[in-house]
Amino acid sequence: MKLSAKTKICLIIGDPVEHSLSPAMHNAGYEALGIDNQFVYLGAQVKFEDVGVVVQAMRKMGIHGLTCTIPHKVEVMKYLDEIDETAKKIGAVNTVLNKQGKLIGFNTDWQGAVVPLEKITTLSDKKVMVLGAGGAARAVIYGLLRRGAKVKIFNRTKEKAIELAKEFNCLSGDLNNQEEIKDFDIIVNTTSVGMKPLENETPIPVKYLNEKQIVFDIVYTHAETKLLREAKKRGATIIPGIEMLLHQGTAQFEIYTGQKAPEEVMRKTLLQVK
C-alpha cells in the first residue's frame, strides 16, 4: 500500500464503530484490484450530535466516501445535497459519495438483503416473513418488494409492524399466530435477537421451521446465530448475516471506486477477521 496526498479517503462513522469489519473488507478489495494507492478506508467513532460537523469536514477536506452505520443513517440525510430515490423510499442513507463537491446519499442495505437470497432462489411471489420493524427492516422490505416478493411484517410491538406495512403497502402479522411460520418460503430476522445479551434466544419458536424454507439472519456477530443453528438442524437453507454485510459492502465499493468489487476476496477477508 503506497499512500500519497492523492489517495482518496473513505470513512465509516458510527457510535460505536471499533467493531466494524468494513475497513478490512474494503481495503482488501482495493488491494486485490491494485488500487490501494488510490483509495484507503478508515473508521471513526462519531457522536450523533457531531454528524453535521463530519459532513462539513467531508465537504471541506474532500473526503471521497462516507459510510454511515448506527445511529447515523437517518441523521446524515439532512446535510446532503442529493439523495437517490431508493434511499428516500427506505428513509435512510448508509453511503455518501463526494462527487466533485456534491454530496450524494445512497442506500445499499437493500442489496445486502436481496443478493444473498437471489443466489439461492427467485424472489418473485415468494412468501416472506420479516421479523422486526426498525431501520434494517425497512431496507430489507424495500428490496424484497422491489423483487416481487409477498412480504408480511412481524414485530414484538404489533403497532409498529402495522404502521410499516401501511407505509410499504404490504401485510403485517401477529407473532401469537405461530402456526403460520411453517407456511413461509423465506424468513428474515432483522431484530437484535441473536446478538449479546440475547445470543441464546431466537425471535420465533424454531419447531415450526422446516426443510422447504430459507432462513436469513442479518445479525453478524456470530457465524451462526441460534436461529440459524436450529433452522439448519431442521433441514432449512440458512444464510448468515455476514452475507448482508458483504453485499451491501460490494455495492458500496462499486459506488466509491466505479469498479466491480472482488466479492470472493472481500468475503474471505470478512471470514478471517471475524
Which residue stretches match the model-derived regions?
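Phosphate/diphosphate ligand-binding glycine-rich loop within oxidoreductases
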Residues: K2-I120, E224
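Glycine-rich adenosine-cofactor-binding loop
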Residues: G14, G105, L117, T121, ...
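Conserved beta-strand positions in the Rossmann-like core of class I SAM-dependent methyltransferases
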Residues: L42, K152, I239
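Short helix-loop-beta connector
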Residues: K99, T122-K127, N210-E211
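Conserved S-adenosyl-L-methionine
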Residues: R146-K150, R234-T237
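NAD(P)-binding Rossmann-fold cofactor-contacting core
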Residues: R147-F168
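Rossmann-like adenosine-cofactor binding region
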Residues: K166-I238
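Adenosine-phosphate binding glycine-rich loop
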Residues: I214, I218-K274
